[in-house]
Amino acid sequence: MIEIDGSFGEGGGQILRTSVALSAVTLKPVRIFNIRAKRKNPGLRRQHMVAVKALAEMTDAEVRGLELGSTEIVFIPKTLKAGTFRFDIGTAGSVSLVLQAVTPAALFAPGEVRVQLRGGTDVPMSPPVDYLRFVFYPLLERFGAKTELVLKRRGHYPKGGGEVEFASRPVDSLTQWGEVERGEVLKVRGLSHCVKLPKHVAERQAKAAEEVLKKSGLKNVDIDLEWYPPERDPHLGPGSGIVLWAITERSLLGADSLGARGKRAERVGEEAARKLLEDLSTGKALDRHMSDMIVPYVSLACGRTEVGGAALTMHAWTHVHVVKKFLPELEVEISGELNKPFVMRVKGVCWQR
C-alpha cells in the first residue's frame, strides 16, 4: 500500500485529492495520514469528503476513516467505472476542487462519465468554475481529453447552491503536450458576473479590468457580462467575480478575482487584470495555477515534454512528490526557484486505459 504524509509541502487538501485521484486511476491502494496538518483546522472538511466519496463510488472502493475532522484515511479501489454520479457538497464547498479530483479518473474510465455537483462555484481559496470552463479544460483538450462542463447555477460563499454538470468521454491514453513560451498574446477574453446584485457591479468589474489591460498595451480585450434581473435571478447569492483569459499563439493563461462584502467592484476587476499581466510578463506558457494543475496530466501522458510556468508554487512541488509515489517510473526535472518562473521537463509514463 502506498503511504502518503499529508503534511508534506504545503500540507493542504490538495495532497489528499491528488492521492485519491491517482489511486483511482492506477487502482493502487493508498493510506494518507496527517491530512491537512498545516491548516488551522486540520483533517477532512466536507468538500474533501465529497471528493473521496465521488472517487470511491467511481471505483467501488473500500474507504476507512472517512469522517469530518479525520486526519487519516485508507482508500482501496477495486475497479474504475463509467456512469452518472450525483454529489451535493453542501453550502459553498468548492465544486472546482472536487472536479479536479474526479477528472483524471473520469478520463480513464471505460465509458462516458457524467458528474452532477451542487456546492460553491465561485468561492475563496479555489479556482472559480469559469477558470475550469475557459482555461483548464480547454488546455486538457490538447492532451486529447474530451470533456464538457456546463454551469447550471452559480453558488457563492457562504450560501452556495451552485450546480454544474461535467461530462467526459474515455481516452485510451493522453497525448503529450507542452510549451515553454506562450508566444504573442492574440486576444484577452473575460466574463464578469454578479448575482443578487445590481448590474453595475458586473459592469464596473469589467470596465476596471479592461482599463488596466489596455493601459498595459493589450488592444484586443473583450469582457462579457453575466447579470440577472431580480425577477429572474435563481441564485442564493449575493456574489460577484471576474475571470480573464489570454489566448496566445501557443497557450491559454487565466486569472480571476472574487467580489466580497466591502470590496469595491473596481478593485475586483483590477486585481484579476494585474494577476494576468504579472503571469503574462514572464513570457511562460502557463499561468501560476495551471503550472500546478497540469502535473498529473503531463505525468500520465505519453512521451517527453517541457512546460514553462509563470510561478513555481509549493502546490506544484507537492503535486510532483505525490504523483511520483504512484508512478515511480515518472521522470521530472524542474529548473527554477520557488515563486519564480520555471521550466518543468517531464517524461510521462504513457498510462493506458
UniProtKB/Swiss-Prot annotation:
Sites where the protein binds ATP: Q100, H289, M290, S291, D292
Subcellular location(s) per record: Cytoplasm
Annotated catalytic residues: H315
Record field: transmembrane: none
Domain of life according to the entry: Archaea
Protein purpose: Catalyzes the conversion of 3'-phosphate to a 2',3'-cyclic phosphodiester at the end of RNA. The mechanism of action of the enzyme occurs in 3 steps: (A) adenylation of the enzyme by ATP; (B) transfer of adenylate to an RNA-N3'P to produce RNA-N3'PP5'A; (C) and attack of the adjacent 2'-hydroxyl on the 3'-phosphorus in the diester linkage to produce the cyclic end product. The biological role of this enzyme is unknown but it is likely to function in some aspects of cellular RNA processing.
Similarity section: Belongs to the RNA 3'-terminal cyclase family. Type 1 subfamily.
HAMAP family: RTC
Protein's name in the database: RNA 3'-terminal phosphate cyclase
Species annotation: Ignicoccus hospitalis (strain KIN4/I / DSM 18386 / JCM 14125)
Organismal lineage: Archaea, Thermoproteota, Thermoprotei, Desulfurococcales, Desulfurococcaceae
Gene name of this polypeptide: rtcA
